[in-house]
């Protein structure tokens, strides 16, 4: 196969060592992104993930920083083991996926019965595609998570965590596949990767006169004091299950979970929801009898399918109760007297700032919710829930004044202790589907090793670390805060899969999300550890914490002491990490674990500084999924469009934290724009403008603004904003300039800096043009980022351009009204001097009376006082940028309109344009001349 153009350029960059970062006297910038799990081919969704840090890394290098952007491969866990097993068993779906979608040759596919072969094949493919994309990665630091050196690093990490009491053994809830009979992680799933495990309190409501117990699941046991009734779904078939000698009424879904979480759970009967309506149950905390009523908002797949109603604090309950009051015929259908519902009134349990006595009803009103089926209910529920959790205090007698958070735990403990409640674990969202196709459950594993994320002190340190971090976008911070708050103990090891054995219990393997929390520290020394094999924990104690005697440690590890000290110096240079980038679905696990583990293992001066969260990739409007075949492989996109087109599309289609949608039609549009850009540079980069008029200076001022805005946007990872401005924005400026001047010679004045601005996003094209067209010998990455101060700052010209654009619109409107034929003379009347004086006074925040008093000193103006007053009133509505000087604007406007006259004749029917700076002395109808204003000239079409 012939060498692709980008391959030659990449080799030149690689030979020049452009991306290899070593400590020096420059300020460092260290950026990492989640390393890939190479179990399949790279698609364009992955490409966006790695493009964002690459753009930022290139940008910061050009600003003069020493930038480290490394990469590795995550191969821990069971996914590739499962894939190898399925291929070995001849599973057609798996074989078809790898042969037909990923294009794996038969001779390679035959080797895929071994998980190592899968990892090696796709790691090679990933690296090749990353190079084709031009990612500026320091590949010297590459590793896999099963390398002996990395396993030594994980061993050190877990010994340290155990020393701190943060790893323990006991019962623990995990995502579990009943078919595979194994816990599952994110990489093991076809669907439901975002689902977390949540603990629910099961409140028991005994049915009066029966041995049945309606069991309601809740996150908010503290609200039980405000329960008015219990809801069931009329057409749902509930199960009667025996648990510890009690007969519970729950949904089929709850039964599936309970079987995996408790011993001896047996299904003994069924009962339809409609059979339960009208029964009375007992509130275990108040002893009151509560009616069982019908509700449609219940989703039996979540919780138990039974809900106790607290209309004062739960918007869905309030809406459902009001629905029944508005339409009592529903009750009559089930033989319930409507008066039962009429008598139900909300009971306040919690007081919270910003809400009245019944927050749920406030939320219904605020969101305009009128029924229990309104989709806004979920949002309203979350708002009330969060407000009451963080700011609410109890108002019920026994707990009056107690914060909700404290009361919740106390009430839950009492209910469980008295036998009136139990606990069940469930997923935050469903379905959760294993790669084998089975729906997963939450299972309690016994004798399981887990990380104690529930530890109060650890949570506090994690919260402190988060508080110091910059989060992009900022609104995601609340998700991190919530996750730290609810995150419970996490099963950190499994019996099977690839990875690092627990050092004190080697039958267990550290699972993927637990061995990928602080590897950013490992990158700093990864290239120095290659080939060193297993290392004692003391090496990492010294490198990362400065603990121990380097000579003794070096001797024990078989290292040179200079080598060990160089590792310590390198870590000290690069840490703390500046930016960690990853997808939004990892906020509730990996990214929060990353915060916890840094808080536990490293001193505060080494805590990471920032996180950027990505959105998801869509293909023609549908979520990308390799397992479902709904992807565009990156290799195919690169073959068809080339790297710069792919990069520019991914960069400008959405901000990093937004979902982007890959559509071939749009990508082809980007391709056409990029071809036009290259043509412009090749045709006009060597041109220049000698005597620059107002239009030339306008263009250069606007380019100054482009440089400033692009720089600002890139600093904040606003990649789309940056390159919509720097690429499409400048292309638009050139079109507007050409419309006014008839050429684009001005391009030669900005060509160098434009290529520099665009280099982070389209490095291949810009580097090629830099050398071939501009004749430079250097690489653009070695050049300095453009300095906006090298361009004129004349904001008045931007205003003048806006005046011109509006003037053209006004002329076209008049043409339509009077039916003007092409060939007329266009007279443009600029406002008289006194109006400019009035505008200046107004912009100095002078009151109307002060402005009039100043103007009335002019005898000529006094004679037409009413007219002047009317015009001054008009001018008070004008708004100008603060940095615009009125005198300069008046001068600039005259000069600009004269220089841009071509646009007026090209875009209107005028054959000639005459600009009058003094309308009183100019020819033409008086009413046309009198209509002139500073920012809106008067016009007359002389036919």
From Swiss-Prot:
GO cellular component: cytoplasm
Organism domain of life: Archaea
GO biological process: leucyl-tRNA aminoacylation
PROSITE patterns (UniProt xref): AA_TRNA_LIGASE_I
One Pfam family, short name: tRNA-synt_1
CDD domains reported in the protein's UniProt record: LeuRS_core
PANTHER family: LEUCINE--TRNA LIGASE, CYTOPLASMIC, LEUCYL-TRNA SYNTHETASE
Name assigned to this protein: Leucine--tRNA ligase
Species of the source: Methanopyrus kandleri (strain AV19 / DSM 6324 / JCM 9639 / NBRC 100938)
């Amino acid at each position: 196969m012939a060498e692709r153009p980008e391959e030659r350029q990449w080799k030149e960059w690689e030979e020049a060592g452009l991306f290899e970062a070593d400590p020096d006297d420059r300020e460092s910038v260290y950026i990492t992104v989640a390393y890939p799990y190479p179990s399949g081919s790279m698609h364009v969704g992955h490409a966006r993930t790695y493009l964002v840090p690459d753009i930022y890394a290139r940008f910061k290098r050009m600003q003069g920083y020493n930038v480290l952007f490394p990469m590795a491969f995550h191969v821990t866990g069971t996914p590739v083991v499962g894939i190898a097993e399925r291929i070995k068993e001849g599973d057609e779906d798996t074989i078809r996926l790898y042969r037909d979608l990923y294009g794996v040759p038969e001779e390679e596919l035959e080797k895929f019965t071994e998980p190592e072969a899968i990892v090696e094949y796709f790691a090679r493919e990933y690296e090749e595609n990353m190079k084709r994309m031009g990612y500026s990665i320091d590949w010297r630091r590459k590793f896999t998570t099963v390398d002996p050196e990395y396993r030594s690093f994980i061993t050190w990490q877990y010994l340290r965590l155990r020393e701190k009491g943060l790893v323990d053994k006991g019962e623990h809830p995990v995502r579990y596949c009943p078919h595979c009979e194994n816990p599952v992680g994110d990489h093991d799933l076809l669907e439901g990767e975002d689902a977390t495990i949540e603990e629910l309190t099961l409140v028991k409501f005994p049915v009066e006169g029966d041995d049945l117990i309606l069991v309601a699941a809740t996150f908010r046991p503290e609200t039980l004091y405000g329960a008015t009734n219990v809801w069931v779904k009329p057409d749902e078939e509930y199960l009667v299950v025996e648990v510890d000698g009690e007969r519970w009424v729950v949904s089929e879904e709850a039964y599936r979970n309970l079987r995996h979480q408790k011993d001896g759970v047996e299904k003994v009967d069924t009962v339809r929801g409609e059979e339960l309506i009208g029964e009375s149950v007992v509130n275990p905390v108040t002893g009151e009898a509560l009616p069982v009523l019908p509700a449609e908002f219940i989703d039996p797949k979540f919780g138990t399918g039974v809900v106790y109603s607290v209309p004062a604090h739960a918007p869905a309950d309030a809406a459902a109760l009001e629905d029944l009051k508005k339409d009592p015929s529903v009750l009559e259908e089930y033989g319930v007297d409507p008066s039962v519902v009429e008598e139900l009134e909300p009971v306040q349990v919690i007081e919270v700032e910003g809400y009245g006595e019944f927050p749920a009803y406030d939320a219904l009103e605020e969101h305009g919710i009128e029924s229990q089926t309104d989709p806004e209910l979920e949002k309203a529920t979350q708002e009330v829930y969060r407000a009451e959790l963080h700011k609410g205090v109890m108002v019920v007698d026994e707990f009056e004044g107690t914060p909700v958070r404290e009361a919740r735990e106390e009430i839950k403990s009492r209910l469980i202790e008295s036998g009136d409640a139990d606990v069940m674990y469930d997923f935050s969202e469903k379905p959760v589907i294993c790669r084998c196709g089975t729906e997963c459950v939450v299972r309690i594993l016994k004798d399981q090793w887990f990380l104690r994320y529930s530890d109060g002190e650890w949570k506090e340190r994690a919260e402190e670390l988060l508080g110091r971090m910059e989060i992009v976008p900022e609104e995601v911070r609340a998700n991190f805060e919530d996750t730290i708050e609810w995150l419970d103990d996490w099963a950190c090891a499994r019996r099977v899969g690839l990875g690092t054995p627990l050092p004190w219990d080697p039958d267990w393997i550290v699972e993927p999300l637990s061995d990928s929390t602080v590897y950013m520290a490992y990158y700093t020394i990864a290239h120095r550890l290659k080939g060193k094999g297993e290392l004692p924990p003391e090496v990492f104690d010294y490198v990362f914490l400065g603990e121990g005697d380097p000579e003794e440690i070096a001797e024990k590890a078989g290292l040179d002491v200079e080598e060990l000290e160089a590792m310590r110096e390198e870590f000290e240079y690069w840490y703390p990490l500046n930016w960690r980038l990853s997808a939004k679905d990892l906020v509730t696990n990996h990214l929060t674990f990353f915060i916890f583990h840094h808080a536990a293992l490293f001193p505060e001066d080494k805590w990471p500084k920032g996180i950027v969260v990505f959105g998801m990739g869509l293909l023609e409007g549908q979520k990308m999924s390799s397992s479902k075949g709904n992807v565009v492989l990156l290799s195919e996109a690169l073959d068809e469009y080339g790297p710069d087109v792919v990069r520019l599309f991914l960069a400008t289609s959405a901000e990093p934290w937004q979902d982007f949608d890959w559509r071939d039609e749009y990508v082809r549009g980007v391709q056409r724009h990029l071809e036009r850009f290259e043509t412009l540079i090749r045709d006009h980069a060597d041109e220049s403008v000698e005597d620059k008029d107002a239009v030339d200076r306008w263009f250069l001022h606007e380019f100054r603004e482009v440089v400033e805005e692009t720089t600002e946007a890139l600093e904040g990872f606003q990649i789309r904003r940056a390159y919509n401005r720097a690429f499409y924005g400048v292309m638009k400026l050139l079109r507007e300039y050409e419309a006014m001047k008839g050429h684009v010679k001005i391009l030669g004045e900005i060509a160098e800096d434009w290529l520099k601005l665009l280099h982070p996003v389209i490095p291949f094209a810009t580097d090629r043009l830099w050398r071939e067209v501009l004749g430079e010998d250097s690489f653009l990455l070695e050049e300095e980022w453009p300095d906006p101060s090298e361009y004129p700052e004349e904001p008045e010209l931007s205003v003048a351009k806006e005046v011109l654009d509006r003037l053209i619109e006004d002329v076209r409107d008049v043409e339509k009204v009077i039916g003007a034929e092409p060939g007329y003379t266009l007279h443009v009347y600029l406002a008289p001097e006194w109006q400019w004086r009035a505008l200046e006074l107004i912009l100095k925040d002078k009151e109307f009376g002060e402005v009039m008093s100043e103007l009335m000193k002019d005898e000529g103006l006094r004679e037409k006082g009413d007219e002047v007053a009317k015009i001054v009133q008009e001018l008070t509505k004008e708004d100008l940028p603060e940095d615009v000087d009125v005198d300069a604007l008046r001068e600039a406007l005259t000069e600009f309109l004269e220089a841009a006259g071509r646009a007026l004749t090209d875009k209107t029917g005028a054959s000639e344009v005459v600009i009058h700076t003094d309308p009183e002395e100019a020819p033409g109808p008086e009413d046309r001349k009198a209509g002139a204003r500073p920012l809106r000239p008067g016009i007359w079409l002389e036919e």
